[in-house]
Swiss-Prot record:
Species name: Salmonella typhimurium (strain LT2 / SGSC1412 / ATCC 700720)
Family membership: Belongs to the glutarate hydroxylase family.
One Gene Ontology molecular-function label: ferrous iron binding
Protein name from the UniProt record: Glutarate 2-hydroxylase
Annotated S-S bridges: none
Cofactor note: Binds 1 Fe(2+) ion per subunit.
Biological process according to GO: L-lysine catabolic process
Length: 325
C-alpha cells in the first residue's frame, strides 16, 4: 500500500444511527461501504416518484434533482452529506448501494429512478453518447460481435477509468445490475489507486504526464479524438488517472511499450477487489482514484446480464484534474 491514504474506516459515520438507511463496511474492503435503504424508505420513495416515468426524467433534467431531494428528505437529510463526504474521501470513495424490495428486472424503471436520485445528490450525470441519454442500459450475452470489450463475456474487461475519450470531467461512475440470467462469474473488479503496488514507479515515470491521443470505436458515437495524459494530480497533488487500454493510441515505440507495461502492472495487482453485485444493487465510485473492470463469465447459451451506467461530475467541492480536462 502507498502512503497516500491509509485504509481507515470513518467510525463516526459507521457508528451513527441513520434515518432511512444502514451503513457498514463491505465484505471486500473498508474502503468500500455498503449502504442499504430500508424497505419503508424504498416503498415511500417509489410511491412519491411514481408520477414521473423515466421518460419524464429524460426530458426534464430538473426532475432528476427533484427525486434526489425526495430521497434525501426520506432519509432525514442525512443521505446527501454522507454520499458527498464518502465519495470525496480519498481513503474511501466507493459505495455498494441497495434498496430493500428492489431486486427484480420487472422493477427496471424503479432501479433507474433510484440510481438517478442518488447520483443527482452528488452532482449531475453527463450525456452518454452511446445511448443518447443521461444513462445507458446495455446487455451482455453469450455471443458478442461489438467493437469493444464492454459486452464481451468470456474475457476479463481490464481495469480502467471512464471518461477517457470525452471532454467532460468524469468524477463519478455508477454501475447498476438490472438483470441476470444463467450467470456464473462476472464479478466487478475494483482497484483503489493508493493500493496499487506500482503506483509510484509509473506516476513518476517521464511518460506519466505526457499528453497522449485517445480515440473511441464507432459504437461510442464520439467522432473526435481527445488529448490528455494518463496521470494527473488533484488539488492536493495526489495522483489521479484517466486510463483505458482499449482507447489510448500510442504515437511511437516508447509510448506503446510503457503503456503495455502499465497494463500488465494493473492487471497483476494483488489488491484488486472482486465484488459481486446482485440484481438491483449498484456501485458508485470516485472515478479519479478508483479503477474498475469485470471478471469473465462462465459460458452458457442463454447467458444474459443487463446493466445501467451513469457517469458525471461532482457539483460540490471536488478534486478535479488540474490540467488537461
Amino acid at each position: 500500500m502507498n502512503a497516500l491514504t491509509a485504509v481507515k474506516a470513518n467510525t463516526d459515520d459507521l457508528a451513527q444511527r441513520h434515518t432511512g438507511f444502514t451503513l457498514a463496511p463491505s465484505a471486500q474492503s473498508p474502503r468500500l461501504l455498503a449502504l442499504t435503504f430500508t424497505a419503508d424508505t424504498t416503498k415511500q420513495f417509489l410511491h412519491q416518484v411514481a408520477q414521473w416515468p423515466v421518460q419524464a426524467l429524460e426530458y426534464k433534467s430538473f426532475l432528476r434533482f427533484k427525486i434526489g431531494k425526495i430521497l434525501d428528505d426520506l432519509c432525514g437529510n442525512q443521505l446527501q452529506p454522507l454520499l458527498i463526504k464518502t465519495l470525496l474521501n480519498r481513503a474511501q470513495g466507493a459505495l455498494l448501494i441497495s434498496a430493500e424490495g428492489i431486486d427484480d428486472v420487472a422493477q427496471a424503471e424503479e432501479m433507474v429512478k433510484l440510481a438517478t436520485a442518488v447520483a443527482h445528490l452528488i452532482g449531475r450525470s453527463n450525456y452518454d453518447a452511446m445511448s443518447g441519454q443521461y444513462y445507458a442500459r446495455f446487455v451482455v450475452k453469450n455471443v458478442d460481435n461489438s467493437d469493444s470489450y464492454l459486452r464481451q463475456p468470456h474475457r476479463v474487461m481490464e481495469l480502467h477509468n471512464d471518461g477517457t475519450y470525452v471532454e467532460e470531467v468524469t468524477d463519478y461512475v455508477l454501475m447498476m445490475k438490472i438483470d441476470e440470467q444463467n450467470m456464473e462469474g462476472g464479478n466487478s473488479l475494483l482497484l483503489h489507486l493508493d493500493d496499487w503496488e506500482h503506483l509510484e514507479s509509473f506516476f513518476t515515470h517521464p511518460l506519466a504526464r505526457r499528453v497522449m491521443r485517445w480515440a473511441a470505436p464507432p459504437s461510442k458515437n464520439v467522432s473526435h479524438d481527445v488529448w490528455h495524459p494518463v496521470f494527473d494530480v488533484d488539488q492536493q497533488g495526489r495522483p489521479v488517472m484517466r486510463y483505458i487500454d482499449q482507447f489510448v493510441q500510442p504515437k511511437d515505440f516508447e509510448e506503446g511499450v510503457w503503456l503495455s507495461e502499465l497494463s500488465d502492472a494493473l492487471e497483476t495487482s494483488q489488491n484488486i477487489l472482486s465484488v459481486p453485485v446482485p440484481v438491483g444493487k449498484f456501485l458508485l465510485i470516485n472515478n479519479l482514484f478508483w479503477l474498475h473492470g469485470r471478471d469473465r463469465f462462465t459460458p452458457h447459451p442463454d447467458l444474459r446480464r443487463e446493466l445501467m451506467r451513469q457517469r458525471g461530475y461532482f457539483a460540490y467541492a471536488a478534486s478535479h484534474y488540474q490540467t488537461h480536462q
